[in-house]
Amino acid sequence: MTGPDNSLTDPSASPSTPVASLRPTAEQLLPQQRDQLHAFIERVLADHPDHIVDCCVEYYTNTLPNGTAAYGDLLALLAATSADADAFTAAVTAIQSPLLSGDGPTDGPPAQESVTAHARVVAEDMSALRGRVAADDATATGSEATADEAAAVAELIERAREMNQNMEEIDRLAAQQSDNTDNLKAEISDISSAIEQIAASATEVNDRSDEAQSLATDGYERAVAVVEQVEAIHDGVTEVRHQTATLQDHTEAIDDIVEVINDIADQTNLLALNASIEAARADAGGEGFAVVADEVKSLAEESKTQAEEIEERVENIQVETRNAADTLVELETETEDSLEASTSSLDTFEEIKDLVTGVSTSLDEIKSGTERQTESSEELTMMIDEAARKADTISDEVASMADANHAQLQKLEAYQSESDQSR
């Protein structure tokens, strides 16, 4: 008969996968306060004997964190309390179930890597401890120990099969998480593409907004120039109207002077007529005086004729001046209306310029926001990639653990078969 495989009972044997490094991760399922852990274990094991509870507390507070170095303390406690190995294993399993399902004393659901690490560490510990207990019992009790060892091996086989089922479920959940991660990554990629399109559109609209702002500024400057020109025209028209009014006043003064000249000509003509009469009375001595009187009369008549011509021209000038004055008044009114319209247009251009500036500022903010969203989506994609890598690592670890557990199950079954044949 071939002897039992020492790798099942010797804690110094190298496991198929490294487990010691997983213990800190396994501890993440447990609360940091020992009293909380103690209360949790007592609550889960309310129907178990006190010495079993004490052994479980010893395992979770000392053995699980410290590994093989603390096996002796737990084995001593098991021996001192005469604790049944099967009852102890069942109690540890009872505590493990709510921890792995997320009903443990810590807040929130457990991380996948913590669940995997905890399951692997406990599986190794239970296998090694059961082997040590079985070996000690065999040395102490002989054939009775062999029977107990067979029962222990059967229990280990059952636990290993349950562990296989758990590993299959964990592997299924890991695969599902990987699929969900891939789907989420695809969704994030679509969102990133949409954000990039929005950013591109915002950039294009922002460029056009800058062009509109430039045009609005140019239009505003042109409107300012038009207003200044209209103001200059209005001032010029007002000045010409004032000058025309002054000219009209001067022509009226000329008209008064012409009337005076006409009066003088009439009086001179009357004096010349009187002089002619007096010269006729004076006979031959008044001939020279008569000639002078005729000359004076001729000059008076010519002066009157010139004065009448001047008066006619002055009247024409006055008519034209009045017409020009009326036209200038109308032109001044029109320039005032144009000035008012130009000022209103200037205000409108200023409002357009302010609105376009506001739109440009808003578009700059949208552009900055989309850039931040793009950065966030890139960071999220990196986080999802990291989560996917961890999920793949967990899946690989679970597969490795399942292989190791399956190999151990085969060894246990072979050991059980050999033990049955040796009886």
Swiss-Prot record:
Gene Ontology biological process: chemotaxis; signal transduction
UniProt cross-references to SUPFAM superfamilies, sorted A to Z: Methyl-accepting chemotaxis protein (MCP) signaling domain
Keyword DNA damage assigned: no
Region named Disordered: 1-21
Disulfide pairings: none
Family matches, as InterPro entries: Chemotax_Me-accpt_rcpt, MCPsignal_dom
Keyword entries, A-Z: Chemotaxis, Cytoplasm, Transducer
Parts forming coiled coils: none
Post-translational modification: Methylated by CheR.
Signal peptide coordinates: none
Chief location bin: cytoplasm
Cytoplasm recorded as keyword: yes
Protein task: Potentially involved in chemo- or phototactic signal transduction.
Family recorded in the similarity comment: Belongs to the methyl-accepting chemotaxis (MCP) protein family.
PANTHER family in the record: LYSOZYME-LIKE PROTEIN-RELATED (PTHR32089:SF112), METHYL-ACCEPTING CHEMOTAXIS PROTEIN MCPB (PTHR32089)
Protein name stated in the entry: Transducer protein Htr13
Organism whose genome encodes this protein: Halobacterium salinarum (strain ATCC 29341 / DSM 671 / R1)
UniProt lineage: Archaea, Methanobacteriati, Methanobacteriota, Stenosarchaea group, Halobacteria
GN (gene name): htr13
